Amino acid sequence: MRKLTMLLGLLISSFAAIGADMFNGADNFYKSDKVTQQKVTFKNQYQMNVTGNLFIPKGINQNAKNPAIVVGHPMGAVKEQSSNLYAQKLAEQGFVTLAIDLSFWGESEGKPGHLIAPEIYSDDFSAAVDYLSTQRYVDAEKIGVLGICGSGSFVISAAKIDPRMKAIATVSMYDMGSAARNGLNHTFTLEQRKALIKSAAEQRLVEFKGGEIAYIPGTVNKLDESTPAIQREFFDFYRTERGGYTPQGEKEALTTKPMLSSMGKFMNFYPFNDIETISPRPMLFITGDQAHSKEFSEDAYKRAGQPKELYIVPNAGHVDLYDRTDLIPFTKLTSFFKDNLK
């Protein structure tokens, strides 16, 4: 276990982040007075209940067909972290929006919690499209998707096989497959990757025999002098009043931490393969110029077919675009979806 901890620490510390004034403009728990909110539940194709927050602009004509957007939260987070903010801001611009909890996270179904399951995560977005398509005030031909952080890779995976997603946007995207296999900037060796896979397989057997579940470190619960910059960036969001949120029935210390035994599923996740087949549906990749995750948006943009756009936000890091309303380009997102969901 000590060797595993060292390997996971190396993976995390390979992610270099640039420090920023994290709290300036941060508004994760924003509450709009221009939209209504209701909790909804629907089933994915695995017959698992997916829970989301549905936001509808006040005064919208519910006898008309309106454009809609599904919003996905960062990996390890829940809908109350970042995605509710984006969903409300976009709903203020006239879209019906739906911020979902991915299966095994938050209020959505899935046992054991925090299981890594990218195929199911991707299906959750298609299930959200199913749900929106049945609402009388939504135009089923005008539904877009937006994925933040890890959900960026899940919406791309979903959009490749779901043409009902008419416009695809990502913000601070992580390719969760590449991040697990290679670390950032491909700093993880094949031997280290194999060691992690071996540890995950061994832990799977432990759990099969009734042993305790082990978790990938996720966001640290406290800082010390040795804490890597990337962890400090996430800590400033997930472990402070800025963005910290513990779903009912969960332990705060375990939030953001996926199950180790399911790690191999990310190793076998290649969301950018065949990304060009999404064309001619438009894609928008938003990243910060200081984001440690910028390589993933650049890679996706390079591989994607037309029409596509890479939009780089000046002076923004990865987590800045979770909640810093002074940096998040809501005007750009609004114009992208209005232009392509009409």
Description of each model-found segment:
Residues 278-279, 284-287:
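Short beta-strand/loop motif that positions the catalytic acidic residue
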Residues 22-64, 322:
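N-terminal cap/lid segment of alpha/beta-hydrolase-fold proteins
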Residues 304-319:
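Catalytic histidine neighborhood in serine/cysteine hydrolases
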Residues 76-88, 102:
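The serine-hydrolase catalytic nucleophile loop
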Residues 156-240:
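Alpha/beta-hydrolase-fold enzymes
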Residues 43-45, 79, 105-144, 323, ...:
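Catalytic nucleophile-loop/oxyanion-hole region of alpha/beta-hydrolase
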